[in-house]
Design a protein with these regions (language model features):
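Catalytic beta/alpha-barrel core
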Residues: 68-71, 116-129, 141-144
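N-terminal amphipathic alpha-helix/helix-capping segment at the start of soluble metabolic enzymes
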Residues: 1-17, 81-85
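Glycine/small-residue-rich loop that forms an oxyanion/phosphate-binding "nest" at active or ligand-binding sites
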Residues: 60-115
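Glycine-rich, proline-tolerant flexible connector loops at the mouths of alpha/beta enzymes
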Residues: 23, 40-72, 99, 127-130
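Active-site mouth loops of central-metabolism enzymes
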Residues: 14-28, 92-104
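Conserved, mostly hydrophobic/aromatic
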Residues: 16, 35, 46, 112
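Short beta-strand/loop segments at the ligand-binding rim of alpha/beta enzyme cores
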Residues: 10-15, 86-96, 137-144
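Conserved beta-strand positions in the central sheet of alpha/beta enzyme cores
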Residues: 15, 41-44, 121
Length: 144
C-alpha cells in the first residue's frame, strides 16, 4: 500500500499546494515543514514551468516568479531532499509532461526516489502516453 493511499485511508485528506521556489527555495522548504505541522496529510509541490496551461493566473504567476528567482528542477529536487529529513507525510510533484521528458523519464523518477517524492501529477499527459509513463513510474515506486 502506497504512502499516498494511506493518506486517504478511511478519511478525507488535507492536501495543500505550493509552487516550488516561490518566492524562493528556502521559504518553500519552510512552508513544507509548516504544512505538515498544520495538519496536512499530503503536500502537492508544483514544479515551475514556463507554460503552465492547466493553471489559473495565480499559479501561473507563482511559476513565473519562481523561475525568475532561479528555481530549476534540479534545485527543487535538492530542496525537497533537505525538507524530507523533517517532513514525514507523502509529497507529490505537480508537473507537466514537457519537463519530465526534457529531464528524461528515468532520470526524473530516479531523482524523485532520491529526494523522497511519493508520486507525480501530470495534467497534460496524453492518454496515449499514460501507459508508458505509468510503467516507468511503477518501476521506481512512484505513484502516477
Amino acid at each position: 500500500m502506497s504512502n499516498i493511499y494511506k493518506a486517504f485511508e478511511n478519511k478525507k485528506a488535507f492536501i495543500p499546494f505550493v509552487t516550488g521556489g516561490d518566492p524562493d527555495l528556502e521559504t518553500t522548504k519552510n512552508l513544507l515543514i509548516a504544512m505538515e505541522k498544520a495538519g496536512a496529510d499530503l503536500i502537492e509541490i508544483g514544479i515551475p514551468f514556463s507554460d503552465p496551461i492547466a493553471e489559473g493566473p495565480v499559479i501561473q504567476e507563482a511559476s513565473q516568479r519562481a523561475l525568475a528567482a532561479g528555481c530549476t528542477t534540479d534545485k527543487l529536487f535538492d530542496m525537497v531532499k533537505e525538507a524530507r529529513q523533517r517532513v514525514k507525510i507523502p509529497m507529490v510533484f505537480m508537473t507537466y509532461i514537457n519537463p519530465v521528458y526534457t529531464y528524461g523519464k528515468e532520470r526524473f523518477m530516479k531523482r524523485c526516489v532520491e529526494c523522497g517524492i511519493d508520486g507525480i501529477i501530470v495534467p497534460d499527459l496524453p492518454y496515449e502516453e499514460k501507459e508508458e509513463l505509468s510503467g516507468v513510474c511503477e518501476s521506481y515506486g512512484i505513484d502516477l
